[in-house]
């Protein structure tokens, strides 16, 4: 079956020693001398109608409560053309949870060998976030997983600090869906 052949080849390309999800997204794959592009980048201009048409054919999708094993589920996974590229653990400060809980969850409950989290072959980035702050890791490695802040910073000049600005009419992490998690970024 063609679909099974493509999936098998894709998995092989992403999991081999010098392979990666990023590489197959950037360069596509070749099967039986046929190039298969897995992502079309945004053209620099609108002059090339075909390049723009192909870019607009990319399919971005979001799944919530993605089951990754009998006992595990991830809050959100974002896909590009069917390939998982971002995982997110979301916590609500009002429920007395924070991004710290999401980081702990990634470090202690997520198996780095799981296909979704496998370094270079799984999601490109894993976000731990609450309503105020966002942290990211590109490699899950159990307790050794290192998370970096993915915040805008708060304040300006010598008053600048960590975290995000506080807004009256939206969440401090609204930049994630307004600016970061958009088709063009």
Segments predicted by a language model, with ranges:
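ATP-dependent helicase/translocase motor core
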Residues: 1-185
């Amino acid at each position: 079956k063609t679909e099974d052949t493509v999936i098998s080849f894709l998995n092989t390309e992403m999991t081999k020693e010098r392979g990666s999800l990023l590489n197959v997204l950037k360069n596509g794959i070749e099967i039986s001398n046929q190039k298969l592009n897995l992502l079309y980048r945004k053209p620099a201009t609108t002059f090339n109608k075909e390049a723009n048409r192909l870019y607009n054919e990319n399919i971005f999708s979001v799944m919530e409560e993605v089951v990754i094993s009998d006992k595990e589920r991830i809050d959100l996974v974002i896909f590009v053309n069917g390939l998982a590229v971002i995982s997110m653990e979301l916590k609500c400060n009002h429920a007395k949870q924070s991004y710290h809980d999401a980081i702990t969850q990634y470090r202690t409950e997520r198996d780095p060998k799981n296909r979704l989290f496998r370094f270079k072959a799984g999601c490109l980035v894993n976000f731990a976030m609450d309503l105020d702050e966002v942290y990211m890791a590109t490699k899950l490695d159990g307790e050794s997983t290192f998370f970096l802040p993915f915040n805008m910073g708060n304040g300006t000049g010598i008053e600048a600090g960590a975290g995000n600005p506080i807004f009256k009419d939206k969440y401090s992490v609204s930049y994630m869906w307004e600016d970061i998690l958009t088709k063009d970024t």
